[in-house]
Each structure stands twice: as C-alpha cells, then as structure tokens.
Design a protein with these regions (language model features):
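Short, polar/acidic, helix-capping and beta-turn segments at strand->helix junctions
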Residues: 1-154
C-alpha cells in the first residue's frame, strides 16, 4: 500500500504513525457511524509502553505534557487510519477532547492540548481546525499524564 499524502507530511515532520494501540478496557478504540469517525481516549503509548505518567505541573513538565498530547494524537490518527484505510479520507477534524492529569495549581491545560491541535492543523490545514476542550483531571487511567479523543468527518 502506498503512503498517503498525510502520512508523507508526517514523515517529513519526522513523526511516525504507530500501530493502533489496543483498548485498555471493555470498549472499541474507534467507531464509524455515517460520515463521522470518533476515537476513544488515547493515551501517550509508544508500543506497549506508557511514556508519560503522573501529574503535569509536578511530575511531568508542561512541555512534556505537550509532547504527550502529540503522542496521544498520533495514536488517535493510527486508530482512524485503521478504521478508514487512509488518513486522506478525513475531510475535516471536528473535535479534540483532552484530559490532562494536573497537579494542584496547574492551569495550562490549553498549552498541553496544543500538542494535538497543532499537529492536526499542520497535517490538514484549515480542515484541521476544530473545536476542543482541555480539562484538568485529578487522575487518569493507568496514571497517564494526558488522554485525547478525536472526532473527524469523512
């Protein structure tokens, strides 16, 4: 299978689209209904390793949180590719939903989630601009620093 134009952009950026991570609970990692594809929350996994754990603002730096969100986004894109066959099938990114395991007094969740948002705009241009929420959370599954879900239109 030839590389899609979106995957070519990823490669040019030095980013690698991983294999889609397995679900860590009783749910499906990606679902298509009509012209919408949505992912379940993706964690900052590289292979089977959770690479950023703990609270952003104490155990994890703000910039590492940003990188964690980018990894979550790459995992979400891997799920979407698994569902569609190609990331070029995405017409528009609709929504990014993000949770940041935050230390008390950490209020820069928006910067952390920019790790996902900026990647999507770099890949899809205007069609990558999306609605978003960035929520501070006390705890996340497996002690992950960040969790991201994405909705796209196809």
């Amino acid at each position: 299978m030839s590389q899609s134009s979106i995957e070519a952009i990823l490669a040019k950026r030095g980013d690698i689209l991983p294999s889609p991570p397995a679900a860590v609970g009783f749910y499906v990692p990606v679902l298509r209904t009509g012209n919408l594809v949505m992912t379940s929350g993706q964690l900052p996994m590289l292979g089977k390793e959770l690479v950023f754990t703990g609270k952003v603002g104490s155990e994890v730096t703000r910039d590492d949180g940003y990188n964690a969100a980018k990894i979550c986004c790459l995992n979400a894109l891997a799920q979407i590719k698994h569902c569609l066959g190609s990331l070029d099938e995405v017409r528009r990114v609709i929504r990014v939903e993000g949770f940041v395991q935050s230390a008390a007094g950490f209020h820069d969740q928006a910067h952390v989630l920019n790790g996902a948002s900026e990647l999507l705009v770099d890949l899809y241009g205007e069609a990558g601009k999306h609605t978003r929420f960035a929520v501070g959370a006390n705890e996340l599954p497996l002690n992950a620093a960040v969790e991201v879900a994405i909705w796209v239109e196809v």
